[in-house]
Amino acid sequence: MTPSLTPGRERWLLLTLAGVQFTNIVDFMIMMPLGPQLTQVFGLTAAQFGLLVSSYNLAAGLSGFLAAFYIDRFDRRRLLLALYALFGLATLACGLAPTFASLMAARVAAGVFGGVLGTLVQTIVGDVVPFERRGRAMAVVMTAFSVATVAGVPAGLFLAAHWNWHVPFVALFGVCVGLLWGAWMVLPAMNEHLHTHAGSAWGRVKDVVTQPDHWRAFGFSVLLMVAGFVVIPYITLYTTSFHKVGEGGLSLEQVPTIYLAGGLATLFTARFIGRWVDHAGKVPVFRRMALVTTVPLMLMTQVAPLGIWFILPVSTLFFVCMSGRMIPGMAILTSTCEPRLRGTFMALNGSVQALAMGMAAWAGGLLITQDAQGRVLNYGYNAALAVCASLLAIWMVGQLRLVDAQHKTAGGPVRMVD
């Protein structure tokens, strides 16, 4: 555990981490609503676009696995600054890419660095913030998703609509430069974990992967990701495809509206859900949110022909529920490993999550089809798979063990049941 921070210093740390996550999320999320432009510019099929989206996650999965061998061997501050600088350069490369192949290569590079960044941010929260406040802390960091959907993605789409798809990535690089300077000023040295490590990196990986509890946590992560990313990457393609043939849907100019509304809603609900998690318990809140999420999952894949005034409330509820289940979900995962192995565990978990996201996005592209007029069909199959994953996650969470709870009980780690 790093030395205790004052409330003010902890707040600035969490806001800085949220800023890093903001750029990471925008870099990933902006690809999905840019789908109609990218498929037109490069002549891509839905499956090829799915591969472009999933390339980021597959690269992040591989780099996350490799990070497990070094993430606990460096000061967290220095590692985050180095990775963030490289991530910014990869984002700039996306903006300068002239061809599909070069864009694919740049997305892979962004995934290599961005995937480890996400893991590192979660690890720092787990190291710095005490267990009893971790739900609220995770909610602060996860407001990055809300701000990304409220400001980042709509701003990126505005730039793309008024110039071209390259401009959002170049602008995001500029934001990264500013945040890198801020992180260098704000982040404290975080090296206490270096004094608790015994043995080699291989030994720590072995300690993580030989514990059945950790494999259950990895399985839980897979279900979390599949439940979202078999559907999310294709929302824009699906809704705009019906508008093109005059059957409701969304125009390209209306797409930012659903991100703006969804982001504003989650901006207000995330803090409430974080407090609810700390008060009512991580597992009960997760189960309730995961069950409720199945409703907008199914509706989101059927609502396009009804037009924006039906799509907007459904998509807003969708964003709120997806964000709401991730707050307790990530708080649970950061608490399933002892502190000395948390960096290694979270690196491996980040790898598992990224691979699951990539495979889910790729599988989602294979499930949907397009008719002769370009309408996206069979999207309901994606929702059915997502609902199954959500229901399995509700069961799986009860099989996990909350290691940090040993500080609150006399009997060691406890199984996470109601």
Language model features with spans:
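Cytoplasmic helix-loop-helix junction between adjacent transmembrane helices
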Residues: A106-F145
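Extracytoplasmic gate region of multi-pass secondary transporters
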Residues: M31-M32, H214-Y259
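Conserved MFS/SLC helix-loop-helix module at the cytosolic interface between two early adjacent transmembrane helices
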Residues: L62-P98
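C-terminal membrane-cytosol helix-exit motif in multi-pass small-molecule transporters
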Residues: F173-H193, M396-L400
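Helix-loop-helix hairpin linking two adjacent transmembrane segments in secondary transporters
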Residues: V140-W184
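Juxtamembrane intracellular "pre-TM" segments in multi-pass secondary transporters
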Residues: T2-P7, A189-G219
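C-terminal transmembrane helical hairpin of 12-TM major facilitator-type secondary transporters
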Residues: V283-P328
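Helix-breaking motifs and short loop linkers at transmembrane-helix boundaries and internal kinks
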Residues: G43, D75, L96-S102, V303-P305
